């Protein structure tokens, strides 16, 4: 996810984003035919932050500042699923931002959704469960100093892994809920200015994550006892990487580069190419999903504050996000 920045950082970020606007469309190679599926209402806080795929190809989406989760069909139709309880002060104590927002999203096989909530209050911040047709219930508490962000489920163990962007920690908690365990800390998770650990995925027995401030993608093996193995740096030089998705079972990665207003394809050797830019319709991308030859990109427009949207493009690489 991405945030409203301090003035100095905002100016620099705006300049970086503006630089992409003068280039030709970057939809190249495996990515083609980009088009906007859905425009959102910025003034209503409808800023799409994270996404989980339904079996039929529909998208479950967190609307960050609105504190909502909704379903979006492949034709752009919308259905509100749940609204998280709003803090009385609007989340004024939320770290870095100063307002509350819904963040990472995970869907289990029975249709239950798990959503991260950074609210600036001990009684609200943490992980919330939304059963089909039900109301949100907090299952794991984090302190007001936490910024739960990207999240993924290890289906082998039933554990959720949560990237905490301000406390520089990867938390682990069972689906049933409970007290989160600090699974991983270390220098690779440090933040220098805004956000540290951000996007998070489970892939082939390892936790993968982005560190936005450090511009890296990291791989952390999970050993047979569930402990974190040595942290491996898989890619560097990325401009504020946010959420990402694997192309099928490979180690090719599509990643949202929020401040650059770009989407990149990262190869297994760590090299990357830009495949989408602002000229294709991006508005500060925060998350991506891959399904049935389609690449979906969520843009929350946190810095641009213009046109939050969901963009879809054709992808000739693989079937579904992992």
What are the residue ranges of the model-derived segments?
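Beta-rich, blade/repeat-based domains predominating
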Residues: 41-58, 87-117, 121, 142-160, ...
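Hydrophobic alpha-helical segments and helix pairs
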Residues: 126-175
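Secretory targeting and sorting signals
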Residues: 1-28
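Short loop/turn segments immediately following the C-termini of beta-strands
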Residues: 64, 118-120, 165-166, 212-213, ...
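Glycine/small-residue-rich hydrophobic helix-like segments
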Residues: 214-283
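A short loop-to-beta-strand structural motif that recurs across blades of beta-propeller domains
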Residues: 68-70, 125-128, 169-172, 216-218, ...
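Short loop/turn segments that connect beta-strands within beta-propeller blades
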Residues: 72-77, 130-135, 174-178, 221-226, ...
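A short beta-strand motif characteristic of beta-propeller blades
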Residues: 34-42, 78-95, 135-141, 179-191, ...
């Amino acid at each position: 996810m991405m945030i409203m920045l301090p003035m100095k950082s905002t100016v620099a970020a705006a300049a970086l984003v503006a630089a992409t606007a003068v280039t030709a469309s970057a939809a190249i190679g495996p990515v083609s035919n980009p088009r906007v599926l859905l425009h959102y209402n910025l003034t209503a806080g409808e800023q799409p932050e994270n996404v989980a795929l339904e079996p039929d190809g529909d998208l479950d989406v967190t609307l960050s500042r609105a504190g909502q989760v909704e379903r979006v069909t492949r034709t752009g139709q919308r259905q509100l699923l749940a609204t998280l309880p709003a803090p009385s002060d609007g989340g004024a104590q939320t770290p870095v931002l100063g307002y509350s927002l819904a963040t990472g999203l995970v869907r289990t096989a029975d249709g239950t959704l798990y959503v991260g909530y950074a609210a600036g209050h001990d009684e609200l911040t943490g992980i919330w469960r939304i059963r089909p047709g039900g109301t949100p219930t907090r299952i794991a508490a984090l302190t007001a100093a936490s910024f739960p962000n990207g999240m993924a489920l290890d289906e082998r163990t039933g554990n959720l892994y949560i990237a905490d962007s301000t406390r520089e920690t990867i938390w682990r908690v069972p689906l049933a809920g409970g007290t989160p365990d600090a699974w991983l800390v270390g220098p690779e998770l440090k933040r220098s200015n805004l956000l540290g650990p951000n996007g998070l995925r489970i892939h082939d027995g390892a936790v993968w994550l982005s560190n936005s401030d450090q511009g890296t993608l990291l791989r952390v093996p999970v050993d047979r006892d569930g402990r974190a193995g040595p942290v491996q740096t898989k890619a560097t030089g990325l401009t504020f990487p946010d959420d990402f998705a694997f192309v099928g079972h490979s180690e090719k990665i599509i990643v949202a580069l929020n401040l650059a207003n770009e989407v990149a394809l990262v190869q297994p050797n760590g090299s990357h190419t830009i495949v989408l830019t602002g000229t294709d319709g991006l508005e500060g991308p925060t998350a991506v999903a891959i399904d049935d030859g389609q690449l979906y990109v969520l843009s929350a427009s946190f810095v641009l504050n213009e046109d939050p949207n969901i963009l879809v493009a054709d992808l000739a690489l693989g079937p579904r996000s992992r």
